[in-house]
Structure formats: C-alpha cells, structure tokens
C-alpha cells in the first residue's frame, strides 16, 4: 500500500467512525430522554429512581452483547446515572 492509498483508506475509516459517532450521540439523546421520562413516572408513583439490582443486571446483559464488556461496564453506569441527576438534585 502506497502513501496515497494509506491516506485514502485512513480518511475513509475516519469518516466511518465519525458517522458512527453521530449515530451514537443521537441514540444517547433518545435514551437519556426516555430514561428521564421514566424517572419522572417513577417519582409520580413514589417509586425509587434507582434500583441497583436492575441496573446491575442490565450491565451484565449488555456486556454479553459485545467483544468489549469492560467498556460497557465502564460506560453504562455513567450513562444510567446521568439520567437520574435531575431527580437526585430535587431530593
């Protein structure tokens, strides 16, 4: 592979990564909004916003769906926790 081929291939890969990044951001936005709505529903019905066992099971399950389970175990608690921040601030 010559330098031009390398540069073209690297650019293609970067563009593909950027497209996935954009998809991830859009999906995270949707997930956070749904989770916030769920927190509000739980609050209206006097249910706890945080159920550790449910979140632990979800993380374990999601970890089985990837070749990078440590990444899920690192990211998902932050993602799920972020959705609870407004609820926790009101307590």
Describe the role of every protein-language-model region:
Residues 1-91:
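Domain-level signature for soluble enzymes in the chorismate/prephenate branch of the shikimate pathway
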């Amino acid at each position: 592979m010559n330098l031009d081929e390398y540069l073209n291939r690297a650019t293609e890969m970067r563009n593909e990564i950027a497209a996935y990044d954009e998809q991830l951001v859009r999906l995270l936005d949707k997930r956070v909004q749904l989770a916030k709505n769920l927190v509000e529903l739980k609050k209206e019905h006097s249910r706890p916003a945080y159920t550790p066992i449910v979140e632990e099971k979800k993380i374990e399950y999601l970890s089985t769906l990837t070749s990078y389970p440590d990444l899920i175990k690192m990211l998902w608690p932050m993602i799920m926790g972020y959705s609870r921040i407004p609820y926790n601030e009101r307590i």
